[in-house]
Amino acid sequence: MHHHFYIYIYLVLLAINNSAITATTVADSEPMIFNEDVIDEFIENEIQQGFPGAALIVTRFGQVLKQSVYGYKLKYDENATIIKEPQLVTLDTMFDLASLTKMYATNYALMHLVEQGALNVDDPVKKYIPQYSGCNPKNECREARLIKDLLTHTAGYAPSVGFYNPASVPPDLFSQEKNKTEEIIETKLEFQRPRGGDQIPLYSDIDYMLLGLVVEHISGMSIDQYVANNIYQKLDLKHTLFNPLNTNNNYQKSDFAATELNGNTRNHTISFPNVRTHVLQGEVHDEKSFYSMHGLSGHAGLFSNLYDMSILTQIMLNDGTYGNVKFWSKNIQDLFLTPYPYDPTFGLGWRLNRNKSLSWFGLHASDDAYGHTGWTGTCTVIDPKYSMAITLLTNKRHTPCINGTFDGEKYETGKYGKIMTLVYESMLLHKDSPEKL
């Protein structure tokens, strides 16, 4: 069984109830070419083959061109058995964004703080986190690390550290308590390699855990409070938040796309104290976020849905504004989109389509396109050349896991690039056709 909803909206009509995506460019009255059936057929075919669920929204010139959902938000139980009545993805379904948190929470907070004059990316981290000091025997010192080193993933940290698992870290790095984890990251965690300079970036969650703490130190608020107060509430976003199942929120498990079938055990092959074994639905999957940071971290923990993501991506297309609210200026946004010299696919946090090496941008995204992906199965591509944003949310990890590999990983929908390619081709925005702008 499969389905999709198609909504074609001129958002000017929705301005009455403040739900319009406001853009600096207004579309012509004639409809744009969009042969979307090929996208639907492709994803629905993969759903029939076993891909769990997906949600796709495409906006152009501030107009929603496509908003479609496919498959199931909940399909399996913890025994990897297909349940009697799988729950369909709906337009409201919220997804665990995983590393999209780095952009749509942490980077948005950082760009906003730069706009306020409260943060300079060329400053040492220590300016904002006074206890961030000390050197290792190779004289690699925390004092030398700049905010932009964290943003470009060149500070020298390991890609990940299993703080939550006593079998994977020394005793002094073990933590399932947020305050202790913060202390470890700020004062104990060693560098794996030298700082930046001419180094190729090494993508690291630790960089963004620290950047989340920078936001908290500057603002005196937790990361979730800061983005809620300064960004999400100003946009009236109701479905973008951390720890959404907390009692003060009105959400329940069935509002979410499920992820791993056996908690964090990879089909019962991994165990550590307090490990979850149930189907995850509405709880952040990421172990460092859930166990070590109580769901509030700069690298993972944010949930959102299609509509809210279309608003959040539109801010970037609008150079930092939405409606009459200015979050940051264009020059600050341009700074965060500056390619890192030794790997131009890295900006300040953002991933860039500069040398076409990131397959998830697809074949036709412009050189100016940028975005990010999330481990759970999420991807955004923002392409200012075409005034277009594409958000693809999937729950590809909500599939059986064999020898550490999730069945959902084998499908093109969960690799993103094929879907991005089809979006461009369905709008005739590719090399072999006259561009319709």
Show the residue positions of the predicted features.
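Active-site SXXK
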Residues: 39-43, 56, 62, 96-122, ...
